[in-house]
Every structure is written in structure tokens, then in C-alpha cells.
């Protein structure tokens, strides 16, 4: 029976062979790892560029997306410095603005204050609630004439830009924008489609003229204009596709005429450290540009994480921050709102509780049926009106067979005998006794609910009142 022999020790030649092989292997590994090591060193050396690039992107996002929205509007809605009176509600095909409302008809305009001064006039209106917020390029509301602030008697206002030092004519109230670019997003209460005639007359009582035309008594100008037939990319998608160099170049140029607020001084210092200043686009080296680009993607991730992380909720509903429309140096909040709710009102004019979950914290989905129950004394506390709107995951209205996108206090809702109210939220048509209170959603699709409280009472703003939980029925 044979036996295995012990292995023969390697001789000197074998040892030299293995030594040379190890040297070659080590050299190959070092050469392979050297680029990674070099990248690590470069990342370390450019870490400030990366971090500041992220901060700068979050800081500048609202100004740039507002300008992108302005450019789109000039092609699809009408020229600058001319009011556009929206005469009907949006439908499910509307994608220009995230979470559009179907409670009001808009009167809007992008206004270039450098071509002013401008006179904005509102006729007396004691029939419908209205609010006319003027937003600067950074998405802060600097004036909001309307029912809450100026009453029902209307008003005449002189709109000017930064640095204007002229004399305000008698009879006009001064509104001075801190930026050259101004966006008016006026809203007039509309009680369903049968109310269009009344609201159209009220809209026609809102005018925008140059000061010279107003003083000479000329009518509101009407510029011949043909909307673009091209399918435009929505502003958020344009922002996603924009390179870091294009973004920061646009930001620098915009800041020349839309100056940052005085409180933004420390941020301007940071921008300067990565080669960005008002009116001065960046001229980066390849490595610096790559570093800032990485920072931009980190910023996208940061904001995306901010959007996804759990909010402080009451019965599943979260309420936008009290600084909405007046952000100060809360740049993260300002950027998040610009991404998901560009053009939001001041909380005193409207507040927007929203939810994506039911009472058990499970995501809302059209594969289930839900009930939203308001007790007899639990209806939204408002001085104007309230509604609840359903949106898909794309933040657009949900297509449905009855073209109903919201329910609210101006609808012919059916109340229970005790004065309570049930809203039925589901994809399939409910029984006939529930149809008037039915808010349709899409089968097997996730959705969210957005309440709107116009001219909310204090209880809705200080936390003494909150929306009821969404009850899953099956």
C-alpha cells in the first residue's frame, strides 16, 4: 500500500521565482490602487469645493427655478409685464406647476421692474375672497394685497424694483420688490365651474399698467402673442438635467439684478470661495468644476432625503413651516418648498396640511378605500374657505371619470344627522348616497392628500386644531 510522500522543500530557484512573482503582483496592485489613492487625495484637497458646492446649490435653487418657470411661461402663458387671467381650472394633464389648486382662478404675471414703475390696480370686491401675493426672485412674498390685508375696497399700488428712489404719486401705495424679477400669483375664490362668470368679471377688475400709461389714462395694453406649440420640459425636470456649470452660471447672472438679501452676506462669502459672485459666472478648472458638480449632486441627495424623512405630524398630517413665503436664511426649507410647492402663499393667507399615510401610518393607495371624518365641531377653521385635493405621486391632479379633483365647503356636501362630515376617498364609485362626498383616486396607485385653508383662523396656525386622521376602511 503506497503512502504519500512529504512535500519537497522549495529549492533556491523556486524561492527566487515566487519572490519575483510577488514583487510583480505587489507592483500591479500598487499601480491599480494608485488612481484610487489619487482620487482620495484630490477629494480631500477639494473637500471645501464639494461642501460649498452643495450649500450654493441649495441656496440658489429657488432663484434659478423661478427664472426657468418665467422662461417657460413666456412661451406658453404670455409675455412678461402683462396679466394672464386663467379662466378655467387645470385638469389632470396640467404639469406646469406642482400640486395645482382647483379652488381659485389665477391672475398671474412675471414682471420686470426695470421696465417700470408699474401700477397694479384691484377693483372693489365684496363677492369673493382674493389674495394677490407678489413674490421676489428668491420666492419670498414681499406684498400680498387682498381681502385679508386691504379689505374689500380694492386698491392702487405702485410696483417698483430694488434701488428705486422716485416719488410715489398720490393715491398709490408703494410696493418695492427687493429683486428685478417679480412673480404675481393672484388667486380669486371660485365656487366651482358655474362660478366662472362672476370670477371672470372680478379678474377683469384687476389691471397692470406702466406708470406712464396709468397717468395718461391709457387702457391696459394687449400684446399680440402666439403660444409655443412645442412640448416644453417642466421646470423641475429642466433643473434635474441642468449641469452644475450651467446652473451656477445662470445663478451668477441672475444675482446681478436680483440681489441677495442683506442677511445672505455669509453665504455670498462662501459663493466667492468657489468663484461665484453676482454678475460673475465661475471659471473653474476641470477639477474644481468636477468638485462643485459632486457637491451639487450631494445637495440633490440632501434635499431628497429631507423630503423623504418623517415629518412632525398630527394624526398623520404635516403642516408646512410657519416661515413659508418668508424664509430668511432657512435655505434648506426654501429649496424644498421650491421643489414641491413653488409659489406658496404666506400662512396667514393660506395653509396647506398634507398627508401620505392613513391612521396607522401606512401609505395611501388607491387599492384601498378611506374615510376622512370631521366631527360636528372639527371642520377646518377658516375665514374664507377650505378644500381637500388628491394628487398622484407626480404631484399632479388624478384623472378620474367624474373630473372631480377636490372637495370642500363650497361643494354640495351631504352632512350626517349630527352635523359631522364624511369624505369618501377611493378609486371605485361608491353607493349613490356617498357620491356627493366622493373624492376619486387611481386604482392601485399611491396618492397624497393636500388640504387648503384660505385665510385660516388662529387655531389652524397655532396648533389648536388639526386635520383628522385618514381612516382605512378595507
Language model regions located:
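A compositional/structural signature for long, glycine/proline-rich flexible linkers
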Residues: 2-474
Amino acid at each position: 500500500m503506497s503512502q504519500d510522500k512529504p512535500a519537497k522543500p522549495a529549492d533556491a530557484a523556486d524561492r527566487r521565482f515566487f519572490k519575483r512573482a510577488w514583487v510583480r503582483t505587489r507592483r500591479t496592485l500598487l499601480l491599480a490602487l494608485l488612481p484610487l489613492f489619487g482620487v482620495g487625495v484630490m477629494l480631500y484637497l477639494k473637500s471645501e469645493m464639494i461642501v460649498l458646492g452643495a450649500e450654493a446649490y441649495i441656496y440658489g435653487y429657488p432663484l434659478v427655478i423661478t427664472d426657468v418657470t418665467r422662461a417657460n411661461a413666456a412661451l406658453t402663458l404670455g409675455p412678461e409685464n402683462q396679466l394672464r387671467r386663467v379662466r378655467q381650472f387645470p385638469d389632470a394633464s396640467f404639469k406646469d406647476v406642482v400640486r395645482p389648486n382647483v379652488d381659485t382662478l389665477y391672475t398671474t404675471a412675471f414682471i420686470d421692474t426695470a421696465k417700470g414703475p408699474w401700477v397694479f390696480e384691484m377693483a372693489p370686491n365684496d363677492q369673493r375672497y382674493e389674495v394677490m401675493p407678489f413674490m421676489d426672485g428668491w420666492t419670498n412674498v414681499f406684498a400680498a394685497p387682498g381681502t385679508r390685508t386691504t379689505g374689500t375696497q380694492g386698491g392702487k399700488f405702485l410696483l417698483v424694483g430694488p434701488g428705486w428712489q422716485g416719488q410715489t404719486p398720490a393715491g398709490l401705495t408703494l410696493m418695492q420688490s427687493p429683486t428685478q424679477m417679480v412673480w404675481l400669483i393672484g388667486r380669486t375664490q371660485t365656487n366651482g365651474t358655474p362660478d366662472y362668470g362672476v370670477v371672470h368679471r372680478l379678474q377683469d377688475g384687476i389691471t397692470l399698467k406702466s406708470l406712464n400709461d396709468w397717468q395718461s389714462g391709457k387702457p391696459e395694453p394687449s400684446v399680440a402673442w402666439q403660444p409655443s406649440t412645442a412640448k416644453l420640459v417642466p421646470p423641475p425636470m429642466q433643473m434635474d438635467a441642468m449641469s452644475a456649470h450651467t446652473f451656477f452660471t445662470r445663478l451668477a447672472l441672475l444675482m446681478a439684478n436680483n440681489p441677495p438679501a442683506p442677511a445672505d452676506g455669509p453665504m455670498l462669502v462662501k459663493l466667492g470661495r468657489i468663484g461665484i459672485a453676482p454678475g460673475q459666472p465661475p471659471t473653474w478648472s476641470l477639477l474644481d468644476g468636477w468638485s462643485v458638480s459632486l457637491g451639487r449632486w450631494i445637495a440633490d441627495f440632501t434635499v431628497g432625503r429631507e423630503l423623504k424623512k418623517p415629518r412632525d405630524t398630527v394624526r398623520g398630517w404635516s403642516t408646512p413651516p410657519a416661515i413659508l413665503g418668508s424664509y430668511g436664511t432657512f435655505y434648506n426649507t426654501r429649496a424644498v418648498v421650491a421643489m414641491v410647492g413653488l409659489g406658496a402663499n404666506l400662512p396667514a393667507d393660506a395653509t396647506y396640511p398634507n398627508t401620505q399615510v392613513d391612521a396607522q401610518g401606512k401609505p395611501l393607495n388607491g387599492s384601498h378605500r378611506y374615510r376622512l371624518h370631521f366631527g360636528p365641531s372639527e371642520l377646518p377653521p377658516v375665514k374664507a374657505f377650505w378644500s381637500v385635493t388628491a394628487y398622484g405621486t407626480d404631484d399632479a391632479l388624478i384623472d378620474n371619470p367624474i373630473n372631480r379633483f377636490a372637495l370642500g365647503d363650497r361643494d354640495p356636501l351631504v352632512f350626517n344627522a349630527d352635523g359631522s362630515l364624511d369624505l369618501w376617498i377611493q378609486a371605485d364609485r361608491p353607493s349613490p348616497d356617498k357620491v356627493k362626498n366622493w373624492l376619486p383616486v387611481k386604482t392601485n396607485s399611491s396618492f397624497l392628500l393636500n388640504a387648503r385653508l384660505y385665510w385660516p383662523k388662529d387655531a389652524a396656525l397655532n396648533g389648536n386644531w388639526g386635520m383628522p386622521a385618514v381612516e382605512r376602511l378595507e
